[in-house]
């Protein structure tokens, strides 16, 4: 009989995954393996989404297996767009299940919110390492939610920017962000003000219509587009999507789930894993967009790191 699975809370996960920077090296390997097809040993179907139309939400199921890691996980994630700003329940909630791949036994049930925030930010940092213009000085973050914090953390660890700007739909949340994070961040009153002249832009909003327009973006800038994870949602306008060199985490997922890609008709140039492998170039001299939908193999890497760390210290 298998032993009882361990439960790792958000605090436990945070203890064993203190920085997104810990994920960068293993995630680069996982991205390269994913983009290697069957030879990479990653089995990852596109996420299954169950709409909950009555309550304006959905449930997503994201399984993955990696032969290189010999790890098997699935993440259950919910998103409810009408949550109140004063609600104690976040708009996104996630739980990750880690299995023993040799026999299917459940090893751990762990909070997935910290994992999602940190692995997403780490992948954005990987994309930025390859795609940002040389001598980037200005970082702009659009949005002030959980992902804004995790991105700020890893970006200020991995890169040096002379100026960091933030814009958020509600100024109060931008002020909270500025008063919470270390370092100096300038609040901007409009998206246009925030992005003008920025070298690296991160969009982590709940927008369903474009908020970032190509005419505002500095030629050669790099954009990490994190929000708009449904086929009818967008953060970026047609002009930006079509003028930029477009990179994605998964081409299959982007062509099924990304409104930014589908509604603009933009052509995907490469998966990020292909750039990591060196089989596709990083056009850092051009305007680039990395459209991140998030992948189950990323959750798997983070969950295994957390579980291995917990196991070694128990």
Swiss-Prot record:
Binding residues annotated for 3,3',5-triiodo-L-thyronine, in chain numbering: 47, 257
GO BP term, example: thyroid hormone metabolic process
One Pfam family recorded for the sequence: OCD_Mu_crystall
Subcellular localization: Cytoplasm
Major localization listed first in the record, in broad terms: cytoplasm
Keyword DNA damage attributed: no
Record: residues binding NADPH: 91-92, 119, 144, 146-147, 168-170, 173, 205-206, 292
InterPro entries: NAD(P)-bd_dom_sf, ODC_Mu_crystall, ODC_N
A GO-annotated cellular component: cytoplasm
pH relationship of activity: Optimum pH is 5.0 for the reduction of 3,4-dehydro-thiomorpholine-3-carboxylate at 37 degrees Celsius with NADH as cosubstrate, and for the reduction of (S)-cystathionine ketimine and delta(1)-piperideine-2-carboxylate at 37 degrees Celsius with NADPH as cosubstrate. Optimum pH is 4.5 for the reduction of (R)-lanthionine ketimine at 37 degrees Celsius with NADPH as cosubstrate.
Keywords, ordered alphabetically: Cytoplasm, NAD, NADP, Oxidoreductase
Domain of life: Eukaryota
EC numbers on record: 1.5.1.25, 1.5.1.1
Catalytic function, reaction form: L-pipecolate + NAD(+) = Delta(1)-piperideine-2-carboxylate + NADH + H(+); L-pipecolate + NADP(+) = Delta(1)-piperideine-2-carboxylate + NADPH + H(+); L-proline + NADP(+) = 1-pyrroline-2-carboxylate + NADPH + H(+); L-proline + NAD(+) = 1-pyrroline-2-carboxylate + NADH + H(+)
Keyword Lipoprotein: no
GO molecular function, one term: thiomorpholine-carboxylate dehydrogenase activity
PANTHER family (UniProt xref): KETIMINE REDUCTASE MU-CRYSTALLIN
Family, as annotated: Belongs to the ornithine cyclodeaminase/mu-crystallin family.
Subunit structure, interactors included: Homodimer. Binds the thyroid hormone triiodothyronine (T3); T3 binding inhibits enzymatic activity.
Role summary: Catalyzes the NAD(P)H-dependent reduction of imine double bonds of a number of cyclic ketimine substrates, including sulfur-containing cyclic ketimines. Under physiological conditions, it efficiently catalyzes delta(1)-piperideine-2-carboxylate (P2C) and delta(1)-pyrroline-2-carboxylate (Pyr2C) reduction, suggesting a central role in lysine and glutamate metabolism. Additional substrates are (S)-cystathionine ketimine (CysK), 3,4-dehydrothiomorpholine-3-carboxylate (AECK), and (R)-lanthionine ketimine (LK) that is reduced at very low rate compared to other substrates.
UniProt protein name: Ketimine reductase mu-crystallin
Source organism of the structure: Bos taurus (Bovine)
Gene name of the encoded protein: CRYM
């Amino acid at each position: 009989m298998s032993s009882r699975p361990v439960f790792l809370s958000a605090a436990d996960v945070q203890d064993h995954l203190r920085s997104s920077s810990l994920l960068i090296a293993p995630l680069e390997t996982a991205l390269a393996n994913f983009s290697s097809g069957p030879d990479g040993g990653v089995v990852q179907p596109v996420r299954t989404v169950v709409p909950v139309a009555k309550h304006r939400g959905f449930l997503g199921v994201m399984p993955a297996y990696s032969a290189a890691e010999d790890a098997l996980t699935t993440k259950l994630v919910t998103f409810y767009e009408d949550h109140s700003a004063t609600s104690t329940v976040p708009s996104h909630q996630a739980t990750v299940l880690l299995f023993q791949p040799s026999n299917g036994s459940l090893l751990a049930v762990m909070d997935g919110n910290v994992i999602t925030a940190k692995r997403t930010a780490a992948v954005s940092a990987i994309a930025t390492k390859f795609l940002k213009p040389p001598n980037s000085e200005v970082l702009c973050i659009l949005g002030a939610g959980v992902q804004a914090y995790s991105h700020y953390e890893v970006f200020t660890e991995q890169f040096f920017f002379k100026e960091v700007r933030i814009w958020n739909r509600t100024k109060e949340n931008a002020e909270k962000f500025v008063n919470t994070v270390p370092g100096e961040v300038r609040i901007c009153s409009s998206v246009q003000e925030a992005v003008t002249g920025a070298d690296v832009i991160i969009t982590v909003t709940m927008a369903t219509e474009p908020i970032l327009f190509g005419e505002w973006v500095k030629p050669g800038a790099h954009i990490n587009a994190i929000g708009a994870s449904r086929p009818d949602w967008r953060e970026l306008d047609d002009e930006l999507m079509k003028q930029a060199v477009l990179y994605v985490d998964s081409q299959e997922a982007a062509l099924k789930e990304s409104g930014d890609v589908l509604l603009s008709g933009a052509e995907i140039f490469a998966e990020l894993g292909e750039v990591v492998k060196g089989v596709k170039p990083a056009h850092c001299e051009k305007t680039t967009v990395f459209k991140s939908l998030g992948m189950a193999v990323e959750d798997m890497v983070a969950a295994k790191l957390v579980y291995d760390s917990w196991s070694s210290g128990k």
